[in-house]
Amino acid sequence: MHWAKCFEGIVSSCTLGLFLVAAAQTAEGQTEPVKPKAKTAKQSTMRPSSKASSAAMPNEEDWWKNAVIYEIYPRSFQDTNGDGVGDLNGITDRLDYLKDLGIDAIWLTPVYPSPDVDFGYDISDYKNIDPQYGTLADFDRLVAEANKRHIRILMDMVMNHTSDKHEWFTQSRSSRDNPYRDWYVWHDGKGQTATDKGVPPNNWQSFFGHSAWEWDEKTRQYYYHKFYVQQPDVNWDNPHIHEAFKDIVRFWLKRGVGGFRFDAITTLFEDPSMADEGVVKDKDGNPIINAYGDPTLDSSKTDNQPGLHAVVQEMRETADAFNSPKFPGTRVLIGETYLPNIQELLKMYGSPDKPEFHLPMDTQVGFINKLDVTAFRSKLIDVQTEIGHNIPLLLFDNHDNPRLDMRYGDGVHDTDIQRVLSTVLFASRGTALFYYGDEIGMKTTPPTRKEDVKDPIGVIGWPKEKGRDGERTPMQWDTSANAGFTTGKPWLPVPPSAATINVEAAKADPKSLFRWYQSLIRLKKTNPAFANGANLMLDTENTKVLSWMRQAPGAAEVVVAVNFTADPQIVNLAARGAGMQAAHLTTLLKTPGGPVPRSMESIKLGPYGVYIGELR
């Protein structure tokens, strides 16, 4: 799903370790595990305010509550057969790398058979593997090998639409009286007659430009497609669709998947009135024109409609009912939820008697797209305090958006800025989701010529919209040909930055971003305050430094301070709560080369510097 378009519409553990391991930093800046010092008798008496929230200590059933999830775009991760396209065996071959990084689960973007109009999100068969990625046997091997390493495989589930090559749609468009006709959304045109097709039923638009209605000459009706013409929307008012997708979910659960990420979930239903959507206007009252030359619509009739929550409840019930001793643990449901506020996000969790998503994506924090302390603090407070006992799912990046360097970087301090963002991601309460290559600082590399564009969004919208190829380039493993991704011609060019930005170089450098990710993930899993602690914002008037505390009953408190600027900063957190004045700090992690503070009264941070310390 195209995130930029979605936001445009909105605006108009694995089991915890048996012993605590803290991350300490050597004089050279390398992070390495050490056993913690014995706790002192005196601990801070500060406790969470009414605005602090907490989570239960994760166990095998609750693995997802403090998990680290890694998104893989399979065609760009690792190719093993030389055809230039990544495959399932390539992911299996790299599982030890992912285990070393510290992740708990892999989210795979679609690997089902597909004509690839939208690179897998146009599915023609939900119960098989596309030959370019491998076979069902290859998939089973991936699940089994991942399971040995305590890594779960999460599938992408696309229920809003299918490919127009899917057998359901082939039947549906064959005649008006076919049993599958009502499996999709068909409608007569305005002013349609026996000889004139009229015009589309209303002004609804595709996410990818122009009308969302396509005329079918054979059956003389329009069908609805929220995405590409080749991705007709299924009709969720038809009970057969409900049963068909529950059957698909069970098929993959039986193969051992750990859960699903539900794509474009808020667009399942449309307003039955078929009324036009409102046009979004600027301050002068003029329509805002989007990248495709169309007036921007408010999505009021095609997004987050009644009926959505009942469907999610059905899918949750289906997943919860499945239990296999071969693959124990909760099957987690993640929602791709573009919602305008925290109140709507809260609804996507459901209720105790009617649960919905375990982890609806919070897209408010990670897509601010500028280093604004006040905005980050406000959004983090919302997601940490306004969703009750539920677990936040934070993310900053994915396959539909430019990478972090383009959205947040300044071209000079990009690595330090990515340390800042990863600290917010991993040091906040909840589950963290990040995109392949973020851990080594891969850069957005968009095409410079239209003829090089692969993504249809770029083909349609060029030059204003260059598409998503820039964030989907091959994983950069080493300095060999094609960065170790393939022995053939890669489906997208390997960026020149691979000469210096690659896994091999990152693992050899104790100060690398990769080592920073490793250390943060280790802290998230093994430090009780990080694994089980509430979030409490500190120094809330500061517009340069974002600071917060993690607190868990019976555990030493941890403070985090992050400089959002290119200028050195000094923060005094000692006056922010009772008992903190006398606290001493034990450094858990800091930016390489950064100073070591002795107390809460003077924490010095370099440009985009980070400090994490435990109160003693």
PLM-predicted stretches and their roles:
Residues 1-6:
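N-terminal secretory signal peptides that target proteins for export/translocation
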Residues 597-616:
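C-terminal beta-strand-rich structural cap/linker in extracellular carbohydrate-active enzymes
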Residues 11-22:
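Bacterial N-terminal signal peptides
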Residues 64-65, 273, 278-301, 310-330, ...:
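Loop/helix patches that line or flank the sugar-binding groove of alpha-linked glycan CAZymes
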Residues 21-37:
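Signal peptide processing junction and immediate N-terminal pro/mature segment
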Residues 575-592:
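Solvent-exposed beta-hairpin/edge-strand motifs
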Residues 32-51, 55-250, 254, 267-340, ...:
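Acidic/aromatic-lined carbohydrate-recognition and catalytic surfaces
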